[in-house]
Amino acid sequence: MPPAPDGHRPGPGSLVVGGVSRSFGERVVLDGVSLTIPHGQFVVLLGRSGSGKSTFLRAVADLDHDVEGSIHVAARRAVVFQDPRLVPWKRVIHNVTLGLAGRDVKRRAREVLEEVGLGDHLRAWPATLSGGEAQRVGLARALIREPDLVLLDEPFGALDALTRIKMHALLQALHLKYRPAVLFVTHDVDEAILLADRILVLEDGRLAVDEEVGLARPRIRTTPGFQRLRTELLGHLGVDEGELAEPAEPDGRAG
């Protein structure tokens, strides 16, 4: 894939995508997508199931070589998937340092594991970890590489609601400290609004929405403007909020 034109090359930590397209047979999944993410910006990509969100992220991660268009990414990038893909026969600390060498690697691994709340799990085996703990290892494995760009593909999709809340708080704290550019793929509108500086919606292979999120932080669902933005985004995803309401009991109360 050719690089982006020199006039559009980003500074460190950013991403520039120009006219990216991808087809599978007759089906067009990405249709001329263009996007720039500056250093430090947290961008969330929404879309219906099968909209091409993960296909786009795989292209940016250089995991799909049949994409047309130009993609220029930061030299240091890291990817976190829904399945952290830990090596089962390596202890936690060795999963974090996988593929790295140097005198300070072990020290740095201990530091990042401490940052994600796993300072006492250095010698643990992956099979002993909960889903949330395994995903924390995935984040630590990304952090130790000191990435300028972090790509996350529905990383919390398989976690329970309480663990997701904790992971949201952790991810926001880590982003505030390290300030990489972030592209976070999800189908969860509430998650997008809670985390994003900017929200994109992929529809029919194109970006139908590109909106800055101006809500004050920290955000909760009662933050002024949250519900308005939620309704707007759900509409773009083809969801009527009325469809999400709980059915009423016979006496008229919600169940």
Question: Over which residues does each language-model region extend?
Answer:
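ABC nucleotide-binding domain "signature" region
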Residues: D104-V116, E232
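Hydrophobic anchor residue at the start of the ABC signature
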Residues: L139
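Conserved ABC ATPase signature
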Residues: W125-L129, E133-Q135
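A short, proline-enriched helix->beta-strand linker immediately N-terminal to the Walker B motif
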Residues: I144-D148
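The feature captures the beta-strand-to-loop junction immediately N-terminal to the Walker
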Residues: L46-R48
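Helix-to-loop junction immediately C-terminal to a conserved catalytic motif
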Residues: A61
